[in-house]
């Protein structure tokens, strides 16, 4: 890849295949991104002109107060909502026209979990039914709303249930979403599909009593309210994109956070209102010509520099142009819209014909394909927790982790392991019975849930509810159907089995059994249980237990095969699944004795922490291995040999990292994978680290993870020695060194908590104990990989701040002195000056241990200031800093706020800046337009010689030319647009990303 950069003219076309190593990080489940708009700050609510018939026609409506809401300019003709509201003495009316290419697709049934009705085609309305209330409450700002005011808060969801074929109305009250109601008396609703199938008309009548209004609202009243409009996927199973509108443009809160973000519903005394013309304000055309020519259609980026070479105006970025001669007109203003003095200015121009994206693979995630697809068959299960449960019935295999954010909690596969659907139905304990699945959760609510195996959707018990309170408390690991009408549920801490009526879900008794865990029915009227360390048959009428195998090695859960044999998952030193016949004879042992190691090379022949198990119709044993690095579901042939293994999902937005000398070694968290970039394949190679504590020193960035999930790690080679650096969110980092297949700890920054007795009081007793926190630094001075107390010192002046830490190719550590970014909570500019400090690595001591300077020193000082989002460092010491200028209000130019991406030379001098930047979550931003670093979250890495990637929160990666600071391209898609769910879509809450130039092939 070569770039020619003449001033005032085109550069050579830049065309390349970019492979960002975010392959380990793709969420496998659509993850909602809602654009917070303020095209409308209020809606005018007019008197109903007469009797209103709820028939979906609106021909008896006065629509003069209606407003128009849409996703973005590219889709305003296909994704929009025109909404109107009316009132009379009895009710509030809500109606309008809803444009959607696949209208009225929402599979939430009235007998299902209607609290998820928002997760497809749905209209949400937040409405305070008391006009005397004006609240700025928000969980973002911490402002509170008194309970007496919250009584008037309505959180309403309107949808057409595809399953029921009717309009639904679900509401919860207060900001805590209490007292849920479904289709309460007096509410009427109707949706009518358009003749062309590209939209629908809807209308609702909602009595004032349902809205908790103290009186009918009328002309002269105004209330806080907001619309939130969701467009789901083609199947109606999950949210694709959405908007909020009727919004307070000065708020940076999201709608669900509280009324600080809401606009107004203004009740008019009369109808037939004159139309309000909304005039869009546009910038005046420029007058200073910048000319360029393209031999072929391409994309153009321009910035303006003054005589000293300083960037004064960020112009266009990757703007598409046809072949031929063109002129871009500059208006003579700087990035803050200030006139520039007369003088000599130079235009820097970059052109290219497009950057191609080549999909390689999704490391650590199974599925065909491993990324989410519109039909729900792509990707894998739960990104949180470890593999926990599996059950089979007929040709269905149901498995999952029980917790997730960006992947389905639970999935169904066929007997070959091909995913068929994903669902939010989940718990800790799973059983399947006659076409339905049943979960028991262990949390305080202890819910018993029922779902349909054909669709994954919640379905109702005989009493009409899909979710009930399960009997018992604490871990309830076993659930099995002992006959056609009864479940047995084990309660380990209570030493009993509960009996549950399958049809109603109601408890109908219990029997004693010591320390029960797994349960399994043999299909012939027999029930097996784990009791303590034994496996045996249990009489569900009396609790009488007859062991068939005693003193097993930490037995967990059970499964029976078609012949009535029973399998048990064993841990401890065994790490296998054993199959017994009814007499207790061992028929088969699945997996390598002792399992696979917790640290070191991955051995597929061994299990690790086997837990949930099931035997399918082909006699294959499915095993959930309850470990997270990696997450593996293994499937075994009846003869005990491994058949297949399935992996994932990784925690959402896991940041992958790589060995710069050998990029085929790719890492996600603490697992090393081997990637073949040409074949697009991967396999786990080793687990390199596990968390541990020595002498009070955590050898990792958190108690759960040695390597940061979202931050990943950086591998650095110095003097032939290979090190791994990973920084936590705050006040933590760890350095490890590779020694064969092991990585030994070499340094740790951490917060220590010491309990200090209070001063002795008059009674002669010490006062309350105080917890004192100090930041300590451990350095492995003798290079033995062990912690000695004498190696621990206070961090002192080595680290001014531990926010946005980074490391360079020489093991120098960079930290921020100044304000680290947090999402702005209010108006105002961020202008605090900042410095980037460097703690120099001084090489190695006599014993081979790392040595660092006693204090960090500033290498960049920026008096203009701002809050820092990210730092990246080149091998030559050049520093890149991503800076936020504070809150960008809806409709405000981010370019005018002081937000910027800046490159500083090794001496700390500004080299260039790029000002089309909206940092952080950018909740008030519009979807991506060419050249905009929208929701810029971090400098992804600095491992490429020519390109600096910046991670976008909504699923994009922005490439900036390192030499001149020109925008090159945006990869991926903004999820707040009408995106395509395919291999280029990373989805929202994207924190990861990395880039490298392959040392052997030269490919980026």
Language-model segments: residues:
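Structural preference for beta-rich elements and adjacent junctions enriched in aromatics
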Residues: 26-275, 805
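Glycine-centered coil/turn sites that cap beta-strands in beta-rich domains
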Residues: 280-303
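Glycine-centered tight-turn motifs at strand-turn-strand junctions
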Residues: 311-340
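Surface-exposed loop and turn segments in beta-propeller and other repeat-based domains
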Residues: 367-380, 459-472, 587-605, 647-650, ...
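Signature of short aromatic-glycine-proline-rich micro-motifs recurring in repeat-based ectodomains
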Residues: 378-390, 426-428, 471-479, 516, ...
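Residue-level detector of Asp-centered blade-edge/turn motifs that repeat once per structural unit
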Residues: 392-394, 432-434, 481-484, 521-524, ...
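Conserved beta-propeller blade signature
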Residues: 397-400, 437-440, 486-489, 526-529, ...
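Short loop/turn segments immediately following the C-termini of beta-strands
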Residues: 402-403, 442-444, 492, 532, ...
């Amino acid at each position: 890849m070569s770039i020619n950069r003449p001033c005032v003219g085109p550069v050579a076309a830049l065309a390349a295949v970019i492979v960002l190593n975010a392959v380990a990080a793709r969420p496998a489940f659509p993850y909602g991104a809602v654009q917070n708009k303020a095209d409308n700050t209020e809606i005018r609510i007019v008197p109903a002109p007469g009797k209103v018939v709820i028939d979906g026609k609106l021909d008896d409506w006065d629509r003069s107060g209606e407003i128009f809401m849409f996703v973005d300019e590219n889709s305003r003709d296909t994704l929009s909502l025109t909404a109107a509201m009316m009132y009379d003495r009895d009710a509030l009316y809500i109606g309008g026209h809803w444009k959607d290419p696949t209208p009225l697709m929402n599979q939430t049934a009235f007998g299902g979990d209607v609290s998820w009705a928002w997760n497809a085609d749905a209209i949400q309305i937040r409405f305070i039914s008391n006009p005397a209330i004006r609240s700025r409450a928000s969980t973002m700002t911490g402002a509170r709303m008194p309970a007496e005011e919250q009584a008037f808060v309505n959180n309403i969801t309107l949808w057409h249930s595809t399953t029921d074929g009717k309009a639904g109305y679900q509401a919860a009250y207060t900001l805590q979403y209490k007292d849920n109601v479904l289709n309460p008396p007096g509410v009427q609703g109707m949706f009518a599909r358009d003749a062309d199938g590209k939209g629908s008309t809807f209308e609702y009548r909602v009595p004032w009593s349902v809205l908790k209004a103290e009186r009918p609202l009328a002309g002269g009243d105004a209330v806080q309210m907001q619309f939130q409009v969701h467009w789901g996927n083609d199947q109606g199973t999950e949210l694709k994109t959405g908007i909020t509108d009727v919004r307070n443009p000065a708020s940076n809160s999201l709608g669900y956070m509280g009324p600080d973000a809401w606009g107004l519903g203004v009740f008019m005394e009369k109808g037939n209102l004159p139309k309000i013309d909304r005039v869009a304000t546009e910038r005046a055309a420029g007058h200073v010509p910048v000319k360029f020519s393209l031999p072929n259609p391409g994309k153009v980026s321009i910035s303006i520099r003054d005589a000293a070479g300083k960037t004064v105006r960020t112009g266009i970025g990757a703007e598409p142009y046809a072949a031929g001669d063109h002129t871009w007109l500059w208006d003579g203003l700087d990035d803050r819209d200030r006139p520039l003095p007369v003088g000599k200015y130079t235009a820097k121009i970059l052109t290219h014909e497009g950057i191609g994206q080549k999909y390689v693979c999704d490391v650590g995630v199974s599925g065909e394909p491993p990324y989410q697809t519109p039909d729900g068959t792509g990707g894998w299960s739960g990104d949180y927790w470890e593999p926990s449960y599996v059950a089979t019935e007929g040709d269905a295999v149901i498995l999952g982790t029980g917790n997730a954010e960006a992947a389905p909690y639970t999935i169904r596969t066929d007997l070959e392991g091909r995913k068929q659907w994903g669902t939010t139905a989940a718990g800790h304990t799973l059983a399947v019975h006659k076409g339905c699945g049943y979960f028991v959760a262990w949390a305080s609510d202890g819910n018993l849930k029922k779902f349909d195996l054909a669709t994954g959707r919640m379905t109702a018990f005989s009493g009409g509810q899909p979710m009930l309170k399960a009997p018992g408390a604490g871990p309830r690991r076993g659930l099995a159907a002992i006959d056609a009408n009864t479940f047995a549920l084990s309660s380990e801490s209570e030493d009993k089995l509960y009996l549950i009526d399958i049809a109603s879900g109601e408890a109908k008794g219990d029997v004693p059994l010591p320390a029960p865990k797994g349960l399994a029915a043999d299909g012939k009227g027999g029930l097996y249980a784990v009791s303590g360390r034994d496996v045996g048959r249990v009489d569900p009428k009396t609790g009488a237990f007859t062991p068939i195998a005693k003193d097993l090695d930490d037995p967990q859960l059970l499964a029976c095969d078609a012949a009535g044999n029973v399998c048990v998952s064993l841990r401890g030193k065994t790490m296998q699944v054993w199959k017994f016949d009814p007499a207790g004879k061992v028929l088969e042992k699945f997996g390598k004795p002792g399992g696979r190691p917790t640290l070191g090379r991955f051995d597929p022949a061994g299990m690790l922490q086997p837990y949930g198990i099931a035997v399918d119709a082909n006699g294959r044993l499915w095993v959930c291995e309850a470990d997270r690095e990696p997450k593996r579901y293994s499937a075994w042939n009846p003869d005990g040999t491994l058949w297949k293994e399935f992996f994932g999902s990784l925690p959402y937005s896991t940041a992958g990292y790589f060995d710069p000398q050998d990029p085929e070694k790719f890492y996600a968290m603490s697992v090393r994978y081997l990637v073949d970039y040409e074949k697009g394949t991967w396999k786990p190679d080793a687990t390199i680290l596990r968390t541990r504590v020595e002498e009070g020193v955590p050898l990792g960035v958190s108690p759960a993870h040695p390597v940061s999930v979202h931050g990943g790690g950086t591998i650095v080679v110095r003097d032939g020695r290979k090190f791994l650096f990973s920084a936590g969110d705050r006040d933590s980092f760890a350095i490890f060194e590779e020694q064969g297949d092991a990585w030994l700890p070499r340094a740790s920054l951490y917060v220590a908590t010491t309990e200090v007795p209070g001063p002795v009081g008059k009674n002669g007793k010490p006062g309350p104990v105080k917890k004192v926190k100090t930041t300590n630094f451990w350095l492995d001075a003798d290079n033995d990989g062990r912690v000695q107390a004498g190696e621990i010192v206070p961090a002192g002046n080595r680290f001014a701040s531990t926010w946005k830490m980074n490391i360079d190719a020489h093991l120098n550590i960079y930290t921020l002195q100044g304000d680290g970014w947090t999402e702005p909570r209010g108006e105002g500019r961020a202008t605090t000056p900042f410095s980037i400090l460097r703690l120099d690595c001084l090489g190695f001591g006599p014993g081979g241990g790392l040595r660092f300077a006693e204090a960090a020193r500033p290498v960049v000082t920026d008096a203009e200031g701002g809050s820092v989002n990210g730092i990246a460092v080149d091998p030559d010491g050049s520093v890149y800093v991503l800076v936020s200028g504070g809150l960008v209000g809806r409709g405000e130019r981010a370019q005018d706020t002081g937000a910027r991406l800046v490159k500083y030379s090794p001496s700390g001098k500004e080299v260039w800046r790029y000002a089309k930047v909206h940092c952080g979550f950018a909740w008030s931003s519009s979807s991506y337009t060419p050249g905009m670093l929208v929701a810029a979250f971090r400098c992804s890495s600095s491992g490429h010689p020519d390109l600096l990637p910046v991670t976008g929160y909504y699923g994009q990666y922005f490439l900036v030319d390192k030499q001149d600071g020109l925008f090159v391209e945006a990869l991926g898609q903004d999820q707040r647009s009408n995106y395509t769910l395919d291999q280029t879509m990373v989805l929202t809450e994207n924190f990861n990303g990395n880039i490298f130039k392959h040392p052997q092939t030269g490919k980026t």
